[in-house]
């Protein structure tokens, strides 16, 4: 799933995403086309939707047809999502008469859950939806249409006396029951246009029709409820890429876990997993580094038995696959490299910055939002935007330290020692080099603490190697100081996390055994 509403993604992003999907055999492109921040698809029946709800950033129907044809040629289905009845601010800017509360609407620049919602009690709402579904159903040939259904808080429904009266007259005790009513009527319209409906967890209630497909962002427990109720389902909760989790942690989450409570027949209702890339904190320049290569690992998870769990071998192959994806034109490597050159001002300076950046990963979406209060207008061209989730050094450093932890040949041990020395020395040198550049390139000051810490961590590494090689026990004071450094370096700082700390901790621990 690619969200193109929060930040619009130009067509080249769409095409190269499809190229990457084809390369790793992902076969459904879920296109999140509407949300509070933008209505991104042309409607000829209702042109005000894009005229006032898109900032002029949307796909024409001819462009959509081209994307569908491009995807189809690569064995990929395209399933559009039109998120209703909530997350509809961009719809209501041009068509406020569809709203539950009549007021002026503006495109949301910030992110969250807003009160605006379609009025589910008026026949005019369903007349509009009938026409809209007919138009979009004809444009998208796939059997499925996704209508969201998530995070409608019910506030505007409760604020409208006529809606409250409708609920009372229909013996509805909560807005959840009103949403079920809406979902049932919506599903009837979808069926009339010979389509099937997909929605998020929120559309699932005891009254939800069995042929609605549930996509779960809440987790395996929620998905299990759907399956036990007889609904087909798709798991997405563990595969939200904006959580910035490692490929390892996501790879180990199977859509049907070992401890599932589902019967064999109920397990057949789980259609699989779906990777989700939400766009609150990405742009066209950074999206690929958030999606790839981690998504390749998830593609393998979805196509493999749950017993496939060899993480080191997965990383070995993922490194190779990452280079192959780069050769296909994906920008998960070249995009951050370009960004670092913009920050540092020259290729030579960027090479020094890259040393520091290679040790860092961005904090999760929620952590960044809490610290920065990101919005649609927040610049996404800062140091954190050019860090990569689960960067290669995380696994590479683990492999380099392994000969110190396990029996290794003298040759392997010597090679690891030499490479670790080179790495640690590069960390020590990068800090002063970046300090010298910072006055002329102020964005480097976004990583002031990390610049200092990487020097200290490099010295920790060199001193640990020296102690281990000489079989000399370091002082208790030294060990305490290094453990304190590792602990403070593990804190979220400057919107980043170090990915190098566990192997360094292992080296410090080893010094006490010699």
What does each model-found stretch correspond to?
Residues 122-144, 165-514:
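Substrate-binding groove of N-acetylhexosamine-processing glycoside hydrolases
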Residues 1-195:
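Substrate-binding cleft of carbohydrate-active enzyme catalytic domains
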């Amino acid at each position: 799933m690619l969200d193109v509403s929060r930040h619009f993604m130009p067509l080249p992003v769409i095409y190269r995403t499809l190229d990457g999907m084809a390369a790793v055999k992902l076969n459904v492109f879920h296109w999140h086309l509407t949300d509070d921040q933008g209505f991104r698809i042309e409607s000829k029946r209702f042109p005000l939707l894009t005229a006032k709800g898109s900032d002029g950033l949307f796909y024409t129907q001819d462009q959509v047809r081209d994307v569908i044809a491009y995807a189809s040629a690569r064995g990929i289905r395209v399933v559009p999502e039109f998120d209703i009845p909530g997350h509809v601010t961009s719809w209501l800017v041009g068509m406020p008469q569809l709203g539950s509360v009549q007021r002026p609407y503006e495109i949301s620049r910030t992110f969250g859950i807003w009160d605006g919602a379609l009025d589910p009690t008026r026949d005019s709402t369903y007349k509009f939806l009938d026409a809209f579904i007919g138009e979009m159903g004809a444009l998208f040939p796939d059997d499925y249409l996704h209508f969201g259904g998530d995070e409608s808080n019910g506030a505007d429904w409760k604020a409208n006396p006529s809606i409250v009266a409708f609920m009372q007259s229909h013996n509805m005790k909560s807005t959840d029951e009103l949403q079920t009513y809406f979902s049932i009527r919506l599903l009837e319209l979808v069926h009339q246009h010979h389509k099937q409906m997909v929605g998020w967890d929120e559309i699932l209630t005891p009254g939800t029709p069995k042929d609605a497909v549930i996509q779960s962002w809440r987790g395996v427990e929620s998905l299990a409820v759907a399956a036990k109720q007889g609904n087909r389902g798709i798991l997405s909760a563990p595969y939200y890429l904006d959580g910035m989790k490692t490929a390892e942690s996501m790879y180990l989450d199977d859509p049907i876990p070992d401890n599932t409570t589902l019967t064999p027949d109920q397990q057949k209702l789980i259609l699989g997993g779906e990777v989700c890339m939400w766009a609150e904190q990405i742009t066209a320049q950074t999206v690929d580094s958030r999606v790839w290569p981690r998504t390749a690992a998830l593609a393998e998870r979805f196509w493999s038995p749950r017993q496939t769990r060899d993480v080191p071998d997965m990383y070995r192959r993922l490194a190779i696959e990452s280079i192959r994806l780069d050769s296909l034109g994906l920008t998960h490597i070249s995009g951050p490299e370009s960004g670092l050159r913009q920050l540092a001002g020259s290729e030579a300076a960027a090479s020094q910055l890259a040393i520091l950046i290679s040790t860092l990963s961005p904090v999760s979406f929620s952590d960044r939002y809490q610290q920065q209060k990101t919005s649609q207008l927040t610049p996404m061209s800062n140091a954190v935007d050019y860090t990569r989730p689960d960067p290669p050094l995380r696994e590479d450093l683990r492999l380099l330290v392994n000969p110190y932890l396990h029996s290794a040949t003298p040759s392997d041990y010597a090679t690891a020692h030499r490479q670790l020395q080179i790495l640690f020395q590069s960390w020590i040198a990068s800090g002063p080099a970046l300090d010298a550049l910072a006055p002329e390139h102020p964005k480097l000051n976004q990583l002031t603490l990390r610049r200092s810490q990487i020097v200290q961590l490099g010295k920790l590494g060199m001193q640990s190697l020296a102690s281990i090689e000489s079989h000399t026990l370091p002082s208790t004071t030294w060990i305490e100081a290094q453990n304190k450094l590792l602990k403070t370096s593990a804190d979220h700082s400057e919107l980043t996390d170090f990915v190098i700390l566990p192997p360094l901790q292992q080296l410090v621990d080893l010094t006490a055994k010699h």
